[in-house]
Amino acid sequence: MAKKASDHVKYYNNPDGPVIGTVSRNIIERDGLYFKDLDGSGEYQPFDDWRLPAKERAKAYVKVLSTDEKIAQLFISDWRMGKYPCGVEGHQVVFDESGILDDAWVHGKNIFGEQHLPGTTELIKDWFARHLILRANPTPDDLADWINQLHAVAEECPHFVPVQVVSNSRNENGETVFGMNDAAGVFASWPGTLGIAAAVRGCGIGLVDDFADCIRREWDAAGLKKGYMYMADIISDPRWQRSYGTFGEDPKLVCEIFSHLIPGIQGSSHGVTADGVAVTVKHFPGGGARENGFDPHYEMGQWNVYRTEGSLSKYHLPGFQTAADCGASSIMPYYAKPSKEKSAPQTDKDGNAMELEPWGFAYNKPFIDGLLRRQMGFEGYINSDTGIVHNMAWGVEMLDGPERVGFAVNQAGVDLISGLFDHQYGREAYDRGRNGYYDTHAVPEGFKKEELVLTEEALDRAVSRTLTELFALGMFENPYRDPKKAAQTVSDPRDWDHAMDVHRKSVVLLKNDGTLPLSREKIKQKKVYAECFYKDGERAKKATAKLREDLKGGLFCLTETYEEADYAILMLYPSSGEYFSATKGYLELDLCDEKPVFDVDTEGRPSGTTHLETTLKGVKRIRKIAHAIHGNGGKVIGNLNITLAWEVGSAEPYLDALTAGFDTEQSAVLDVIFGRFAPVGKLPVTLPRGDEVLAVDQQGVCVSPNDVPGYDKDKYMPESLKDENGKAYAYRDTAGNYYELNFGLCII
């Protein structure tokens, strides 16, 4: 294809019906209406008819597709834009004739697996891949051009199926992290999801409607029609690194948020619409019940542990029930598998004992088919987490690749497998059900042949479910978007202003002895010292320079010498651990610099050796700075960026005022500090009081239950740890306030 698709889309307007957009596909006229010729027959077929229900069209169209075309649609994987770096060292882009698609072969390798991949045109035409994950961070017009080009290539295939480009969320501020927060800063940038929760608690649920509507309009304008978003997981183990991305620890609040978020993004409360964006809710049945923070991206974190009776249904399932009730288009199971040996009895929605089969949740029929579908009433499709066939195949390691595909799709009920384009495994799983493979090969112990092969029935079920989404989104009729309109929509200053307003509303005032706000009268002609603290010292220096630049021009005098200052403003941005790899010990939550902490053994128990951990470089200097400022009769203000439930005891006692943000814009925090905006946010998560409430014994059991949210942990804590108010878990500051769920001060 030599032409740029965006410049050659032809549109056909239907009265009281959808616009049909095409670059090269035949258009059928019938009853005075226009329909796209999906199967290339040149004749009207019922599945061409946009007047029919999406599910009906999908079930009819799946019968037309070849076996290989259907198998290809079982898989979704990362894909690259030619104009933007693909992350593969040494890769040389070979553009197609349009100058948009990368048609070079590439050897792709990441933490999810390894694969030799063709160019984009070949992937779409010959492999018939139709589900791609975008991790690049392009401009909206480049994104629309690229997606348009993908659809135009797909139109040249005998059977037209549009290309579904999927992304993790793009509308929150924060540090970009592969596989978690791939892109930020292009689409309207709201605070992190914890900040959204903090603002909702302070200002009401209405802002979620605005947040969702912004996402829907921006994504639809650019042609992005599905998002891996958002997380209905509850924070119950504070050491879980994916606390970032959740809406906190309160199941009721998560349910309330999702009851507005899903319909707002998808376009209705009954599923997706043509101007909506499909939502994939993560990570069923909740990833918060970790075993002392270990993450299932690596082997030590492969278990979900429910040590508290009934915790699964009480805390972890409600958000997913709301997702099912609101018509979420798809749900993503977590990598982990449940531990029967380490868990107390858990019940399903009907009060029956749950089968805690030791299979990853994407392979776990009792959870996916029995609980989620039959009892919770979920009607969308199941989209696995990325890498379940290769590096994160917890519980089914004894199966080979084709058997894992067959077991996930045929037995557990997965409809879309994220990771690599494993169509060859899918074909082998399909053929093994027909070629007598298991007449000469042993069936792995504990499994049955019919569980491990890919049946026609399971294949059609899975593909018809994903096709239903594409039909409902209107992508068969018109998948094309105007790049100029995409750029205009995403740059709308009203959305950016609204997002900034929520940044301000997300700020939580944790401590104040009358220091805040820093009014004109307080700071006029005063000397102010400002510094940023990070885990990385070099990053802290750069951030400090920017902070000081932002503070120039005020009524006060900036000084780089804290010994002479009247006020200090300290911005604290701690971080801990790695997303995809295990730490030597338990994930550190203390604000510390080279703190000796225990290693863990291969079973996840504390060992006798130690190593040094840093979450906030130079944190010990806060005490020195405070001593000097207080000696001058001055005040120290701190702001803590909460991405995890930090232990704040090494900083809070030295601060006269303390605010908290959640990947909140620094300018919004300064608006609160200087009295330009009154703080209204409330904590969406409890901050633990210290290491003593997170201690793990020699059996690997934490003193505070990892499957219970912070607000309820005191019910299960030893009496010896409780204070005179019966509280053990939450941090209590020097003013006597507990930093627990929903806490936040006001300025009167």
Give the ranges of each region predicted by the language model.
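Glycoside hydrolase catalytic-domain context in secreted enzymes
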Residues: M1-I748
